[in-house]
């Protein structure tokens, strides 16, 4: 592969993404080894760029209005193995190695732990670690 001349501006890969009016894109975190869906979070341009640069998931917290490095308080980082963009360019898929085996703030492996049974949402997956132990009690 040839190097590009220094004076040629390369297109920004972030420009290919269809961002929401708020400048966000939904991101799905998937276990790179077994395909389990771990969580969904939002990313802005900066968080997605940092995720690629640092090799660890960085999201945008809408409630806190700031960057959120996954695992910064729990230790349950997500190491980036692959990143994909869907056919409409409006959803990002992060294939990750989930450190500590817990992706959800409830202490479960996945945020998708509820299943619809007889018209009710019921918990289908166990708590691996008490969230108070992970984050401390209020």
Curated annotation (Swiss-Prot):
InterPro entries: PRA-CH, PRib_AMP_CycHydrolase_dom, PRib_AMP_CycHydrolase_sf. Zn(2+) binds at residues 87, 104, 111. Keywords: Amino-acid biosynthesis, Cytoplasm, Histidine biosynthesis, Hydrolase, Magnesium, Metal-binding, Zinc. Its main location: cytoplasm. GO terms for molecular function: magnesium ion binding; phosphoribosyl-AMP cyclohydrolase activity; zinc ion binding. Its EC number is 3.5.4.19. It is found in: Cytoplasm. Mg(2+) binds at residues 86, 88, 90. One of its GO terms (cellular component) is cytoplasm. It catalyses: 1-(5-phospho-beta-D-ribosyl)-5'-AMP + H2O = 1-(5-phospho-beta-D-ribosyl)-5-[(5-phospho-beta-D-ribosylamino)methylideneamino]imidazole-4-carboxamide. Binds 1 Mg(2+) ion per subunit. Binds 1 zinc ion per subunit. GO terms for biological process: L-histidine biosynthetic process. It is an enzyme of class 3 (hydrolase). Its cofactor is Mg(2+); Zn(2+). Pathway: Amino-acid biosynthesis; L-histidine biosynthesis; L-histidine from 5-phospho-alpha-D-ribose 1-diphosphate: step 3/9. Homodimer. Catalyzes the hydrolysis of the adenine ring of phosphoribosyl-AMP. HAMAP family: HisI. Belongs to the PRA-CH family. This is Phosphoribosyl-AMP cyclohydrolase.
């Amino acid at each position: 592969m040839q190097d590009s001349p220094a004076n040629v501006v390369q297109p920004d890969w972030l420009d290919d993404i269809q961002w929401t009016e708020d400048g966000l894109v939904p991101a799905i975190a998937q276990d790179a080894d077994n395909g389990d869906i771990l969580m969904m979070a939002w990313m802005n341009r900066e968080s997605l760029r940092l995720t690629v640069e640092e090799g660890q998931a960085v999201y945008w917290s809408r409630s806190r209005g700031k960057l959120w490095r996954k695992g910064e308080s729990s230790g349950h980082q997500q190491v980036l193995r692959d990143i994909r963009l869907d056919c409409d360019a409006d959803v990002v898929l992060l294939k990750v190695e989930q450190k500590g085996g817990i992706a959800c703030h409830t202490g479960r492996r996945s945020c998708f732990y509820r299943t619809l049974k007889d018209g009710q949402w019921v918990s289908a997956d166990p708590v691996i670690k008490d969230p108070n132990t992970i984050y401390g009690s209020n």
